[in-house]
Amino acid sequence: MKFVDEATIKVKAGDGGNGCVSFRREKFVPFGGPDGGDGGDGGSVYLVATHDLNTLADFRFQRHYEAQRGENGSGRNMTGASGADLEVPVPVGTLAYDAETEELIGDLVEHGQRLLVAQGGFHGLGNTRYKTSTNRAPRQSKPGTPGELRVLRLELKLLADVGLLGLPNAGKSTLITQVSGARPKIADYPFTTLYPGLGVVRVGPLQSFVMADIPGLIEGAAEGAGLGIQFLKHLSRTRLLLHLVDVAPADPAEDPVAAVHTIEAELQQFSEDLASRPRWLVLNKIDLIAPDERESFTKELVARLGWEGPVYAISAATGEACESLMQAIMKYLEEAQSHDADTATAG
């Protein structure tokens, strides 16, 4: 079972600056010697691992990265400035392959780790370098070399940040489709996986997270019939659970409160660790409740449940309030990550 996010990007290092052909020209110095300076080195391209990213979603919007070229040399033996290196942030855990040869260039496993993926071009030489005892006025110089051009395939094992709970008719797959398909603010992203209930949600530049449906909780999951060990491992870093409830079931006899209790009991039996994660109540299909009745309906349902955590009312089908829910999730995940970082520093 593979949960893999992939992206293909093109990286181009900066070309080296050219050397200069120049001669010293001053009053009373009729035969000034060569004074052409060297060019500057081209900038290189590095991938830099960061905990601030969870997915490769941003590479859907920018696929080409180019470092600065070196400046040309000039007279008076002035050397051209070197081009600035370009650092491309990627999530920790990213594997970088050469797309043409499939050679593994590197595995970025630590925050702050840098991986050289395209070497900058070397500087050219000015004509000063070619002065000899027999050639006092060389008109020869050397151009800079081109920077390396490479197509990379980036691969990242996806781990779910947010898990979805709920009965089969609660609208989990509809929500994943809605939030990973509403462009441009929350963009769909083609990733390869054998598991369909997984979505990369892009909230904004450098802001994305992975949402996963937790399947089969009702069908004997506590006895191991539903989730396998691999999928449990996949959910190991889930920071937040969204508990989806169908507030307008097709069968009026179905009680949303009973549906919540059913899932809670099964979850507790299935995994105490997962059951202890923070959980938000998401009331789905709110569009089927009359607008003037929604507030009282929500209050009554929350009171019957004795629910004290966050509550959101949405419509996965129409997209109503979905974006604000995704923004709230992103904020929560960023704050949790920041808290973890502070704790690690203090420890």
Curated annotation (Swiss-Prot):
GO biological process: ribosome biogenesis
Binding site for GTP: 166-173, 191-195, 213-216, 284-287, 315-317
Enzyme Commission number(s) from the entry: 3.6.5.-
Pfam families: GTP1_OBG (PF01018), MMR_HSR1 (PF01926)
Xref: Gene3D superfamilies: GTP1/OBG domain (2.70.210.12), P-loop containing nucleotide triphosphate hydrolases (3.40.50.300)
Protein's cellular compartments: Cytoplasm
Alphabetical list of InterPro entries matching this protein: G_OBG, GTP-bd, GTP-bd_Obg/CgtA, GTP1-OBG_CS, GTP1_OBG_dom, GTP1_OBG_dom_sf, OBG_GTPase, P-loop_NTPase
Residue numbers spanned by region Disordered: 127-146
Binding locations of Mg(2+): 173, 193
Coiled coil: none
Domain OBG-type G per the UniProt entry, residue ranges: 160-334
Gene Ontology MF terms in the entry: GTP binding; GTPase activity; magnesium ion binding
Biased composition regions of type Polar residues, renumbered to the chain: 129-138
Cofactor(s) listed in the protein's UniProt record: Mg(2+)
Obg domain mapped to chain residues: 1-159
Cellular-component GO terms for this entry: cytoplasm
Enzyme class: hydrolase
Assigned keywords, A-Z: Cytoplasm, GTP-binding, Hydrolase, Magnesium, Metal-binding, Nucleotide-binding
Quaternary structure note: Monomer.
Listed HAMAP family: GTPase_Obg
Family to which this protein belongs: Belongs to the TRAFAC class OBG-HflX-like GTPase superfamily. OBG GTPase family.
Function per UniProt: An essential GTPase which binds GTP, GDP and possibly (p)ppGpp with moderate affinity, with high nucleotide exchange rates and a fairly low GTP hydrolysis rate. Plays a role in control of the cell cycle, stress response, ribosome biogenesis and in those bacteria that undergo differentiation, in morphogenesis control.
Protein name: GTPase Obg
UniProt gene name: obg
